[in-house]
């Protein structure tokens, strides 16, 4: 059974978060032009720094664990790369994405020598560093994208890129850069992979909010706005997939997913509770909610002032129903401490926390309730 621990309560909603490799610092976006950095302080967390170089709302952030670099993207159509100096200060570098619409999503590649930025301009900017000119260069993936890119994920080979889009499609494209990447080995996705090769295109019943390659890279999972998760097992280039399995959920849509191992996927979204899906090429199923909302939890939140505040929950469904009935009939309400789940609102992002890519043992979640929660599988 999964256990949870509230690491920190942010003063604002969190739409994206990322930890450093030591898990001693994390950054978060809060629907402003700022990125907030928090660092561990004893048993709690304290605000350490604010990055405010963007002019408009920061839409996504990612932290490269090996190189310790942070990348951000924004509605101002640009990206920034932050590198930590030996004296503890951060050097920021502007990356021109050459977009005419907002940047929506960003992820470092596994080797951390490239990053990809989705956008509302129907293109993906693949950025890499040119040593000769000392700047970041962007190349555009365009074909066959027809709408806003909502999510991205890199294949373990550092070349293939999965994209979830608002045109109700999930794509697998080649982001091979000749001066950066070694020639990739042949796989089920193809052997000849020049830049912008379309390796696969899969349908969905709604916007594709999340995509993710399996640890082996031989399967792709994606979550649609129709409350479904689809797992695709490709067979060969330009051939129908060996299996295309769709799991229909009886809950609100998912926003984020990650592979715990080759046969388990953790996903979360508008339903406030992470869920576990398990299966293989023969079939997948939603096996359980990781937050059943049946046990009482308590935690202490330490803010910047150092004052602790203990909160307890949850309350029963009967109490919630009674409260809303009284508000409707009598115009009165009674105090309710919390909902029956650890998260009190939408879960926006899931991130691996402990384990290896093929065996994730713990992950973190953040959402619009401002909570950053650690889950142990």
Swiss-Prot record:
Main location: cytoplasm
InterPro entries assigned: ARPC1 (IPR017383), WD40/YVTN_repeat-like_dom_sf (IPR015943), WD40_repeat_dom_sf (IPR036322), WD40_rpt (IPR001680)
A Pfam family matched in the record: WD40
Source taxon at top rank: Eukaryota
Gene Ontology biological process terms in this record: actin cortical patch assembly; actin filament branching; Arp2/3 complex-mediated actin nucleation; cortical actin cytoskeleton organization; endocytosis
Keyword set, alphabetical order: Actin-binding, Cytoplasm, Cytoskeleton, Repeat, WD repeat
Ranges annotated as spanning the membrane: none
Gene Ontology CC terms: actin cortical patch; Arp2/3 protein complex; cell division site; cell tip; cytoplasm; cytosol
Localisation per UniProt entry: Cytoplasm, Cytoskeleton, Actin patch
The WD repeat ranges on this chain: 9-48, 53-92, 98-139, 144-183, 203-242, 342-376
A GO term for molecular function: actin filament binding
Gene3D superfamilies: YVTN repeat-like/Quinoprotein amine dehydrogenase
Location of region: Disordered: 293-313
Subunit note: Component of the Arp2/3 complex composed of arp2, act2, arc1/p41-ARC, arc2/p34-ARC, arc3/p21-ARC, arc4/p20-ARC and arc5/p16-ARC.
Family annotation (PANTHER family): ACTIN-RELATED PROTEIN 2/3 COMPLEX SUBUNIT 1, ACTIN-RELATED PROTEIN 2_3 COMPLEX SUBUNIT
Stated role: Functions as a component of the Arp2/3 complex which is involved in regulation of actin polymerization and together with an activating nucleation-promoting factor (NPF) mediates the formation of branched actin networks.
Record family assignment: Belongs to the WD repeat ARPC1 family.
Protein name as catalogued: Actin-related protein 2/3 complex subunit 1
Lineage of origin: Eukaryota, Fungi, Dikarya, Ascomycota, Taphrinomycotina
């Amino acid at each position: 059974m999964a256990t949870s621990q509230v690491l920190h309560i942010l003063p604002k909603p969190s739409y994206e978060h990322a930890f450093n490799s030591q898990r001693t610092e994390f950054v978060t976006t809060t629907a402003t032009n700022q990125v907030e950095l928090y660092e561990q302080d004893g048993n709690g967390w304290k605000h350490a720094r604010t990055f405010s170089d963007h002019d408009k709302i920061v839409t996504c952030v990612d932290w490269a664990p090996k190189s310790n670099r942070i990348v951000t993207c924004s509605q101002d159509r640009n990206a920034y790369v932050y590198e930590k100096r030996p004296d503890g200060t951060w050097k920021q570098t502007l990356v021109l994405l050459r977009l005419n619409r907002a940047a929506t999503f960003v992820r470092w590649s596994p080797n951390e020598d490239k990053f990809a930025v989705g956008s509302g301009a129907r293109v993906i900017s693949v950025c890499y560093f040119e040593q000769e000119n000392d700047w970041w260069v962007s190349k555009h993936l365009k074909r066959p994208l027809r709408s806003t890119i909502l999510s991205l994920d890199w294949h373990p080979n550092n070349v293939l890129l999965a994209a979830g889009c608002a045109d109700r499609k999930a794509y697998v494209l080649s982001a091979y850069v000749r001066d950066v990447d070694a020639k990739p080995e042949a796989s089920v996705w193809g052997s000849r992979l020049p830049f912008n090769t379309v390796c696969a295109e899969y349908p969905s019943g709604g916007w594709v909010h999340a995509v993710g390659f399996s640890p082996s890279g031989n399967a792709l999972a994606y979550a649609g706005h129709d409350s479904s998760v689809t797992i695709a097992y490709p067979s060969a280039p330009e051939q129908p997939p060996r299996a295309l399995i769709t799991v229909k959920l009886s809950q609100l849509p998912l926003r984020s997913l990650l592979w715990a191992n080759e046969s388990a996927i953790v996903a979360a979204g508008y339903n406030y509770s992470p869920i576990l899906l398990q299966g293989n090429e023969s079939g997948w199923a939603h096996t359980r909610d990781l937050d059943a909302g049946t046990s009482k939890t308590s935690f202490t939140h330490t803010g910047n002032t150092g004052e602790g505040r203990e909160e307890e929950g949850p309350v029963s469904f009967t109490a919630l129903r009674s409260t809303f009935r009284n508000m409707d009939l009598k115009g009165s309400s009674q105090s309710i401490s919390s909902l029956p789940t650890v998260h009190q609102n939408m879960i926006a992002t899931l991130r691996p926390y402990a384990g290896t890519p093929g065996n994730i043992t713990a992950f973190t979640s953040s959402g619009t309730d401002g909570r950053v929660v650690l889950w142990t599988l």
